[in-house]
Each structure stands twice: as structure tokens, then as C-alpha cells.
Amino acid sequence: MSPTAFEPVAHTRIPSLGIDFAEYLHPPTGARHFHLACDDPNNAFMVAFPTLPQDSSGVAHILEHTTLCGSERYPVRDPFFMMLRRSLNTYMNAFTSTDTTAYPFATQNRKDFDNLLGVYLDAVFFPCLDPLDFAQEGWRLELAEDGAALEYHGVVYNEMKGAMSAPVAQLWQHLHTALFPDTVYRHNSGGDPLAIPQLSYAALRDFHTRHYHPSNAVFMTYGSFAAAEHQARIEQLALARFKERRAPLISTVQTPFVAPRRLEVGYEADAGEPRNTHIVWAWVHGATANVDELIELHLLGGLLLEHGASPVRHYFETTPLADAPSELSGIDDSAAQLVFMCGVEGSERAHAEALEDGLLEILARVARDGLPRDVVEAALDRLEMAQRDIGGDGYPFGLQLMGRVLAAAMQRRDARALLDLDPVLARLRAALDDPGYVPDLVRRILLDNPHRVRLVMYPEDGKAAHEHELERARLAQMRAEMDAGAIAEVAAASAALAERQAREDDPDVLPRVTLTDVPPPADLLTARERGSATVPCASYECAANGVFRARLACRLPALTPAETAALPLFCEYLTELGCDAEDYLAVQARRAAAGSFQAWALVRPGPADDGALAAWLLLGGKGLARKREAVLATLAEMLAGVRFDEPARLAELLQQSCAEAEQSITERGHQLAILTAAARLTPTAALDALWDGPAAIRALQAATADANEAAVAQLFATFESIRGKLLAAPRELALIGDAATLDGLAPDLAAFAPSAGGVGAEFVIAPPPADEVNAWLASSQVNFCAKAYRAVHESDADE
């Protein structure tokens, strides 16, 4: 292998993650490469650029789309989606955030990695950027069907119309505009639909030239492939063609406020509906790339907001002045500066002052009295578990690690420190010896920090109609000023785009893997059986990085239609209610010290028969290896001990679930349409629609509106009936961890044993009614449509 111009900058072993961290610089161009070496075969790659918007035209977002519409070596219209079918990738994507655009992928196959690397590098450095692709992905003018009016079209234009219909998206954008009024973060990087048509094709090309230069590029790789091999390919495929080194682009920070600010804005909603107002508070404190400030803020967020026993979350959950805590509650580390956010939804404008007084009183109490040391240590343990956990819920671990360091890398700060958290966690544990540490955090970050905004977002009837009228008037004026030649140009451009979209590209222009490139299937983990006849138990030894997992699977028995419909709420609330003699507050605090826990239902069709269901209720828990006994004890009590006698708590949970579901409608519009369209095709599709579709939201609204004493008691009775059936159901236990964690572990299997009663009927799904509606109305600027087709069974032979 020929040597490259990359030079080493730093190298560190990070034991807590089992990786070797190395940083390299490419002096001829200024490009940087971070390599995370380990023996993980799921190798990952990312190239990222600072994309600093100067307006809300969505230029960075539209450029992200347009780069993936063909490049110099791969001049096909849609190489990204074509590669999805020609690749063994475990992940492929591209995304634009507030100040960065990144292109990540992951795969376990060497040839596939090289194929994807070639396509990605050519796309970002040498894209075609055809004007027709800009028209398709960004925006364009088209004549309406009657030819009498103009309309805006475009993928990103329509995408952002839908995205900005979501109240939470509007809330987030208004908040960041208010917090960072003098920086790029005041702009909508995805694109404001009112501003997107102001972007020109020339501005798009200029933005690419300025931002997508190797001097700005950050390359990241992870896994078992060598750094030198990556560098040789990166230099050969891209960097060798650039001779100029520029000063890198870095986002600026906001000058701190000298006094808190307040803002009220309207959003499209029925002003006649009560309690439709969002009220959120946000503070700016510290730099995202400063590991001490980052972890301190996450610690404070965990202490104040993480669960129902956390003081600020408890206040927002129980106040009669609002329905639920805001979805924006938590820490935002997506920009150069950190943001602490909390608030409520389902309130009134008139309640803002009273809610703020209550919030500041809670913070003042914590600043005065502190919090119990065991509560703070539990929050630190959760931070340590987040550092060590390699699970990822299907998201490749290498890309998770890249996400942790991306902000620091783009800011030209110490990326390694954001991976090696053990030193900062040790400093925090030592700081707990000072009883004034947590009170000082609250005062320094929140109470004494004037860089604060209170945002009230209230319902405003007709706001969307007014914006639509502004757009219609603008288009009408443009149409009136057009002569016949200009109109013909619009029609010709539309025809040219339609012709390009209909053209068949040659897929063989793109690389692919063949069966000869696919290695034999990897060996699955071998289970060590250690259970009994009543509770089969299997342990799986793996490199778990100091995290222990346990999962209890209970076979779903036959349920009534009412019980089947209520099962998602049963699962969601199983970890939110009291247990045995403890109320929910005590349980939340105790379990937070042990780890994290969840419950969910899993129903899958048979490989050859849609009606042959594999149906399970799964209880999962994970924690640090030293807390494995507490994880198992909690898992054993979750089903048997849960209390269905806290009506006020259930009413709170219903309100929160309903508020969350209503706010998610426009965000989940495509998914809701797909679920509804597919509901009558298979039994499991019908169940998906019942549990997650529009009908589920309607049922939740009805349950919340009717959450009186009798209705709550009836729901608890349904939960109790489900629990009784599950307690008698067959079950299996699985334990996952490294050898040191599993050796000597002897779970009390009797605590997991089913109750007497034997095996009842199996779970079945009732068919949906024949007159089921398939159209739903929602407050959105765009429509979501879907058509579903029945596919072959999994066991059908390939052709």
C-alpha cells in the first residue's frame, strides 16, 4: 500500500469502550480523519461538513438531497436508493442538523464498504448538481392543472411543509431563534417553506463550493478495517484532486444575555379548544465540545427531569395548570452551545407566570436543600451506563460513537475527551463529597444564569390559512407578471423534469456485491442453559462492556378485544406505577438506581402462515454489571407487584400519552397513512393499526376525555385481567453479559415462575371491521397518502 499524506496527531486507548482512538491530519488539504479501531466487524464511516446557513432557505438540506442525485463517476439519478438494493449495509443515511451535514453508513462486508465509500465520496465532492435535480429536490414552479395558476413543488419544500406543521418542530425553531439571535442557529437549517423559494440554483452551487471542501471535511471510521487502508482510499478517490488548503469554517457562539427574555408566538390550532398552549423555559450554558460542561449538564438534566420522582418533572406532571411535561424537556447538545429545556404542553397563556413561579420555587428548593447522595450517585451510574452501553437499539455502535464526538470535531476541539468519560465521571463522583455541589450546579446553570428564554406558543385560528394566502398572493402576482414566453419556460421545465424522472438509468454503473462476496453466516452466540422446567433460562456470554441485560418473555395468552386494545397502555404504564407497598414515586427513584426497564408486546406472523402467531410480552432491564442482582429483582417484581390502585397517577399518564400522541400526528403522518392502508391485509397489520394507527389516537383521546373515577377503575380492571392471564403464562428468561458478569450469577428462578393455572388459549387477532374508515383529518399543511400491497410470505422461494 502506498503511503498517504495523512499524518498522525494523537493516539489514545479508551478502555471503557474497548477502542483505540486515533486522529490524523491531511496537511495538503486540511482534512481530518478520526479512526476508532476495535475488533467489531460492523465497520462504519462518516464524512461531515460544517454547513452554516445565513438564512432559512434550507440550502444545506437541499444540497444534502441534491448531492445524492448523481455524481461524476456515478451519473445516475438516484444512486443512494439504488445502492440500498445493491448493498449489504447495516445502515445508510444522510442528515442535516443545525450546523452540520453528515453522510454515514455501516456494513460488515469489506467489498461493500469499499463500494459505499466510493459512492459517498464521489457524491459529496464531485456531485452533478443538475439544475433539474435542484428543481426536483428543492423547489420549482409548476402550472396548476387548469394552467391558470402557479404552484410551488419540490421534495424538501413539501417535506418541510409537513415537518413544520408539527407544533413541537415550531416550538424548537422559535426557541433556538430566541436563544441564539446573532448566530446561524437562529435560522431554520431544514428550510422554512416561506423562505425556500428564495433559494437560487447559483446559491446552491456556491454553498457547495464553500462548505464541501476538504479543508472543512471531517472523516470518521470505526471497526476492524485499518486506518491506513481507509486513508489510501480517501486520498485516491477524493483528496488527491484538491491542492488548496483553506481556513476551516467554524460556527460562532452567542453573546450571553444580560437578562432573561420572554416571547409569545402563535401556531395553527383551534383557539376554541382549551389547554392548547405550550410553555417552555430554556437556558444556554456551556459548550457542547467541553466534556465537563456537557456531562455536568446531563447530570443536572437527569436529576431534575429523568423520571416521575425527579423534582421538576414531578412538578410538571402533577400541576393542574397543564396536561403534561413538554416533549422538549431535556438537554439539547445539537448546537455549539448547550441548552437546558423544560416546560409543559396542554396549558393556557394566562398560566405562564404561575408556572414559572412554581418552577423557580422548585429550583430554589433544590439549591437550598440539595438532593440525597444516593439519588445523585444513581444519576451518575446512568451516565456511566450510557457511556458503556453498546446496544444501540439497532443503530450501529460505531455511528453512535461518531455522533458523540461530531460536535467537538466540527468545532476543532478535543474529540477524544467526549469518548473517554471515565475521568470526568470520576471527577464528578469526587465532587459529591461536597454537599454543596448539586446546589451550586442549580444556581450556576439555572437560577443565576440570565441567558434564559420563556416561550409561550398559543393556538391561533387561521394562522395556516393566512400563510397559505400570502403564498397564493405571491404566486398570483408572479403569474400576472409573466408573459407567454415565461409561461412556456415553466411548462418546458416541468416537461424536462418529467422526462428525466421517467428515464431508466443503467444500474450497472454502480458497484455491487455478489454471492461470491458474501462470507458464510457468522456463528450465533451459544446459550448456556441454566433454567428449570417452569422457567427456562439461557445466558449469553458476549463483550458487553460492563453492562448487564436481562429479558423475561411471557407468552401472550388469549385476550378479549378490550384487553388487546389496552395492551400497549398496559406495557407503557407497567414501569410508571407503584409496586407492592411502594407508591410510584418511591418505585421510580429505586428503579432509577438499579438501571432502566421497559415492557413491550411483540407479535410476529409465521414464516408461511399469517395466522400462526408468535406473540410475547417482553420485560427488559439493563444496568451496570455491579447492579445485576438489582436488575433481576426489579424484573421479577414488575409484573407480579405492579399496583393498579393509583387513580390520580393513571389519569396523569393518560393525559401525557394523549398529549404526546396528538403532537406526533404530523411527525408520523406517513407512518399513520401506511398503517391505515395496510390494516386489512394481514392479522398483524391489523394489530399494528389498532395499536399505533389513527384509531389508537382517537381511542386515547376518548379515554383521556372520560378519565373519571369509574372509567379509571374500569381501565385498572382491564389491566388486572391482563396481568392475571400473563402471570399464568409460560415464560423464558435470558441473561446477557460478559463472562465476569455471568459467572457466579444464580438468579432466583422461583421469583420468575408462572402461577398455577396451566396454559390457556393462544393469542389471536380479531379481523378489523369491514366498514373501517381509511381517511382521517388532521391539522397539517400537507396530505399523507399511502397504498399498501400484500407481499409474499417469508418462506416463499426466491425467484
Can you describe what each PLM-predicted range is?
Residues 3-19, 90-94, 757-766, 773-775:
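Short secondary-structure junctions
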